[in-house]
Amino acid sequence: MVGKICGTGSYAPHRVMDNHDLAKIVETSDEWIRERTGIGKRHIIEEETTSYMAGQAALRAVEQSGIDPAEIELIILATSSSETVFPCAACEVQKTIGAVHAAGYDMNAACTGFVLAFNTAQAYISAGIYQTVMVIGADSMSNLVDWTDRGTCILFGDGAG
């Protein structure tokens, strides 16, 4: 059995921090950041949480896919920045989208998290354990990053998909 992507959704916070904004708080420049990373701007949370962003992305994916949330059997949320230890953020997404029959868990694997979660979902489907799995990647790294460290703060933003 092979899995397929039935729908996608994303959420990015409204607040945008461009490289010029970042240069006001750490010694850097737009040119320096772009040369090293190609990044020109990043989305930053204000009131949102990781689970909120994941839930909004999930709602959009469900809408696009046409799948009844009650058909979802498992939700895997790849995140390194959940705001709570429990319930896991995947359980918050389950509640948000109405996936009343789904199990859910968070997977923390940093930058490779979404790929690992996707491969895990594929393995569950191939093994015949689940048929309908939702995979989400979501992080709010702006809460964790050291905004005085020019080498790392330029890399991270917030969002979900």
Descriptions of predicted regions:
Residues L59, E63-A70, S82-G161:
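Acyl-thioester C-C bond-transforming condensing/cleaving domain
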